[in-house]
Amino acid sequence: MAAGSELRPMIPVVTPDEMAAIDAAAPEPATTLIARAGAAVARAAIDEMDGCLGRRVVVLAGPGANGADGRVAARRLALRGARTTVVDVSGVGDRLPDADLVIDAAYGTGLRRPWTAPATESPILAVDLPSGVDPLTGCAMGRPLPAERTVTFAALKPGLLLGEGRRLAGRVEVVDIGLDVSSATAWLVTDDDISQMVPSRPVDAHKWQSACWVVAGSSGMEGAAGLAATAAQRAGAGYVRLSVPGGRAHDRPPEAVGWPLDRNITVDPGEVARFASMVVGPGLGPSGEVAAGVRRIVADTSVPMVVDGDGLKALGNGMPC
């Protein structure tokens, strides 16, 4: 990240139904929102082509708001000197004209049936969502056009993140066009979000200021223990202790310290108190005595704890919801 740049917050993710409600609640007319969306598409097109004057742009435009966004972009690009051609999706043939860029404004999130896109070898910029991708599941419905880049509005859609949609969307840019997405119930966590969660270590820090005890693994599942220990190290733990109940931590990273622990996961509370966090569960296996040990350590331990894998199974089988 460049020095002085601002950290981006988590990105909202909304379903098609949620997006429809957000659009309906917009305080401004649809024409204003379409103008903003089209301007954003035009800017992205210029960026993709590294210029505009004399560039050939084909806009595949549908009948709805997606097509309207594309037509606005076409007019703006023409004003900047691009040679633009708008092809109405209702009359398109098997192949699009050659171009420096094709703007897919055919259907976006509005398609609910299989669609075979016309052939093209030109790079593609998709508007909101590659046409032919299910906006909820990311499944390809028919034969969509694979985009180099997708400009989507207000929030991400699940179809941009899931299934084939993730590949077909290419690089995704979320553009603010003035819609209120505060009602979103799902958010994409970015690298910037994670960087804010992981604290910086002071120069005079020592290992016990952020020690983590990992209780994980079993016979045949030693790799889970090693992965959990490595994750703790990468999250910033200065000292990682790894215990495989009733076994040895064969696959532990060399920086992690092995510590014997019986199958009952009997731990000294005073020893636990030395740690800033614990990880319990990955790869522990279905043993009843191990499950009982997990429930006991969760009940008796006050340090922050991540419970995963077989640890969650142990809690689900032994504790009321």
Where do the language-model regions lie?
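Small-residue (G/A/S/T)-rich helix-start motifs and N-terminal tracts that mark the onset
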Residues: M1-T85, L101, R149, L160-C321
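Glycine-rich oxoanion-binding loops at beta->alpha junctions
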Residues: D88-P97, G110
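Active-site loop/turn elements of alpha/beta-hydrolase fold enzymes
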Residues: V89, L129, V244-P245
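Short secondary-structure boundary/hinge segments and terminal tails
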Residues: V92-L96, P135, H250, L315-G316
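Internal gly/pro-rich beta-alpha loop/helix module
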Residues: A99-L101, A106-A186
